[in-house]
Each structure stands twice: as structure tokens, then as C-alpha cells.
Regions:
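HhH-family (HhH-GPD) DNA N-glycosylase catalytic core used in base-excision repair
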Residues: 6-268
Length: 268
């Protein structure tokens, strides 16, 4: 009995110390300078929430690999969209987008695939947030996975009559068990409003509902800190880590994404 009490007290002390360490890392990395070298800089260029949504989705889609390459190719992507992504989605000549490479294995045909689906969503619902409201994603325990599955349905429906070669490269065809790192990152940008990095243009979703955008850096850091035991970087790992971080900050667990990613990249 006494051993259990002592272990409980020890665990509480360890959690308190770990929370303090994580909070200090948030203070260190959740700063404007961090955003200057992060893909979030692209949706932050816009003021209209719908432009921000589109930029966030497309930028996050190509956010894998080396950071300098991501930023350079996101610039190329936004060169196609122009100064008003919403206008391009609704009125632009999607079929005129060529077969040029945009980012690694993401080519013009993959962008066309995504834009056809977005045109259907914005024509019918007016915004991605309104689409999310229509499918009740904000009431789901795992909004990212629910929204991704429904978005996938629209993407494939909108491309039924389009000649398409290869996988979509936009979202996994089966989202149920994947980490959805890039999609969760886009939701972090759209839902959180910290006045520093994230824009928080969505009102129906709450930061408490967000899940950590898990990548190799944040996963390795989380394991080193004892926050994550699962070895695979999949949905179960995202859930395990997020549930633990909710103990530290139930209203905004994704705030620790800055700490985990920054510490992992810089070896702090």
C-alpha cells in the first residue's frame, strides 16, 4: 500500500517537472522567429479565412522532407495559386496546370486532383469550415480523421471523370490508422489562435480537440521524455501522446507541438 502511494507521489513530481520543462520549451520556440522558417508562413500571408484554409491545406500537403526544400516548393505552389487562392479555386483554369514537379513526388496532376475537390467544396459550402460543420467534424472525438475521410470522398468524387495517373498524394486513401501528421498540422494552424504563430480562423473547433502533428522529430523527443511508449508513428501513437499532453494542458494540448518539434530538431 505504502509503496503504491510513494510511487504515485513520485510520478506526480515527475509529471510536474516534465510539464515545467515542456512549458519552458514552448516559451522558447513558440515565437515569431520560429514561424519565419516554418511552412505556416504561407497561410499567414492572407487575411481572408478562406484563402488561409486553402493555403494551409495545400502547404501542409507538401510539408515533408528538408525544411529549405519545403519552403522553396511551397513558394512555387503559391505562384500557381496567385495572390487569391480562393479565386483560383473557384475560377482558375485548373486543367491548365502542367505536369511539372512541385515537391518531391507531388506533381501538377496531384495539385489538379486536390483543386477539383476543393472547387466542389467551396462552390457548395463556401468554406472548408462550413464543410466541416456540415459533416459534424467538430462533434467527433477525432475530428482530423473524420474530416480527412470525408474530404477524401469529395476528392475522389470530383475526379471521377478526370484522367489521373497514380495515387492522389493529397491524403492517404485509408486514413483510419495513419498519424495524419500534415493534416493535423493544418488543423493546428486553423484552430489555434495564439497571436504568435497559429491563426485560429475556425471558431467551431476548439484547441482542446486537436491532436499532436506527430513526425519523426516530435516522436523521438516524446519517447526520450517518457511521453510516448508506442514504437510506430501511427494514429495510436498520436492518441497516446495527445492524451498524455492533455493531462498537462487539457484546453490546448497541441501547444506542445512547438516544444517537441523544436527540441527534437535542435537536440535540446
Amino acid at each position: 500500500m505504502y509503496g503504491g502511494v510513494l510511487l504515485g507521489k513520485f510520478a506526480a513530481v515527475m509529471d510536474t517537472e516534465l510539464k515545467e520543462r515542456l512549458d519552458s520549451l514552448v516559451t522558447k520556440y513558440n515565437i515569431p522567429e520560429f514561424a519565419e522558417n516554418d511552412p505556416v508562413q504561407f497561410p499567414k500571408r492572407y487575411s481572408d479565412g478562406r484563402d488561409i484554409e486553402i493555403s494551409a491545406l495545400l502547404t501542409s500537403t507538401i510539408s515533408w522532407g528538408r525544411r529549405p526544400m519545403i519552403l522553396a516548393n511551397a513558394e512555387k505552389l503559391h505562384g500557381i495559386l496567385g495572390h487569391e487562392p480562393l479565386r483560383f479555386v473557384l475560377e482558375g483554369d485548373i486543367e491548365a496546370i502542367g505536369e511539372d514537379n512541385i515537391h518531391r513526388t507531388f506533381f501538377g496532376r496531384h495539385l489538379r486532383f486536390y483543386l477539383r475537390g476543393l472547387r466542389e467544396i467551396y462552390t457548395r459550402y463556401g468554406s472548408l469550415e462550413a464543410f466541416a460543420h456540415h459533416i459534424s467534424s467538430a462533434k467527433d472525438d477525432a475530428p482530423a480523421w473524420h474530416l480527412a475521410e470525408e474530404l477524401n470522398k469529395v476528392l475522389h468524387s470530383a475526379n471521377q471523370n478526370a484522367k489521373f495517373d497514380g495515387p492522389s498524394r493529397c491524403l492517404p486513401d485509408d486514413c483510419r490508422n495513419t498519424a495524419l501528421k500534415r493534416f493535423n498540422m493544418a488543423l493546428r494552424w486553423l484552430v489555434r489562435n495564439d497571436g504568435v504563430v497559429d491563426m485560429g480562423v475556425w471558431s467551431e473547433f476548439k484547441p482542446a480537440m486537436l491532436y499532436i502533428p506527430l513526425d519523426v522529430h516530435s516522436a523521438n523527443t516524446s519517447r526520450a521524455l517518457g511521453l510516448l511508449t508506442r514504437k510506430q508513428n501511427d494514429r495510436k501513437a498520436v492518441e497516446e501522446l495527445t492524451f498524455k499532453l492533455r493531462e498537462f494542458n487539457p484546453d490546448d494540448p497541441a501547444v506542445y507541438d512547438f516544444a517537441l518539434f523544436g527540441a527534437g530538431v535542435r537536440g535540446s
